[in-house]
Amino acid sequence: RYPMKLINGKYERISWDTALNEISAKMLDLKKASGPDSVYFVGSSKHNNEQAYLLRKFVSFWGSNNCDHQARICHSTTVAGVANTWGYGAMTNSYNDMQNSKVAMYIGSNAAEAHPVSLLHMLHAKETGCKMIVVDPRFTRTAAKADEYVRIRSGSDIAFLFGLLYHIFKNGWEDKQYINDRVFGMEKVKEEVLAKWTPDKVEDVCGVKEAQVLKVATWLHENRPGTVVWCMGQTQHTIGNAIVRASCILQLALGNVGKSGGGTNIFRGHDNVQGATDVGPNPDSLPGYYGLVEGSWKHFAKAWGVDFEWI
């Protein structure tokens, strides 16, 4: 394979040295004339971790944070929502660990078509008694495998999740010891849920009757540890971040986070969008989710063997 250059309306083959020299010269001219932010770098979730990391390092050396990749329209809402709930924006467990779950609730995920390998683990879990709940506006191929299918209105995920929390709090099903030891602010959530998200309000918003919401809440209570699975169905909303946080809060209330068979299984939209987000070209963070603050830059200046004042 060779690089191609458009000359007189036709692409002609040029050498790698010529391509690198011409591109480098034009980029430096742009930087000199308009500053480092005049160039925008687009990464890819198709890059492996090393390639994504190297691109972020290159952009940092270039003198800019003007970079991004597919996560911006994929799971950036998840990264922010999960990170702001318990500190790190990634799924907590793994595909194979779902075989240790006693109940699994899919909300915003059509795993049968989008992540078929993951569903094999769920089907194995069902063989040992795991209950499978699918919450989706459409009856999907995943819903066809469910023990309980819940049809909600599109975008009403929070109402349904808080409807579950209503019954959990009302019946005292929350893991009080876990919350006391590990969770801050759950009392405020409880107050709001019990005051505002009564069964009639939940049904009005998401279209699910109280009996079915209570049934799902009972299953989540009686079958622990349980996991919550989501994908694009949660993130592709203007309130995607809030939906993600509601899912996380539900798991914290049940004491399911940090346990085998529990947690949040967040299925990504591209093959390495998680790795690219962890270490790659994000405009608002350095590799490993280090924020764009002085301490982070000092850390990476040392790691990269360059002077902090230079970078």
Walk through the language-model features, giving the residues of each.
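Flexible, glycine/charged-enriched surface loops at secondary-structure junctions
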Residues: 34-38, 174-179, 227, 258-265
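N-terminal export/assembly segments and adjacent metallocofactor-ligating motifs
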Residues: 1-171, 182, 189, 209, ...
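Internal, active-site/partner-interface "lid" segment
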Residues: 172-197, 202
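A glycine-rich, hydrophobic/aromatic-adjacent loop/helix-cap motif
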Residues: 220-311
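Generic recognition of flexible, low-complexity loop/linker segments
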Residues: 27-29, 91-95, 213-218, 253-254, ...
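Conserved short loop/turn motifs at secondary-structure junctions
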Residues: 40-47, 204-208, 231-239, 270
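Active-site phosphate/pyrophosphate- and oxyanion-stabilizing loops and adjacent acidic/basic residues
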Residues: 56, 200, 218, 248-251
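Core structural elements
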Residues: 190-195, 213-226
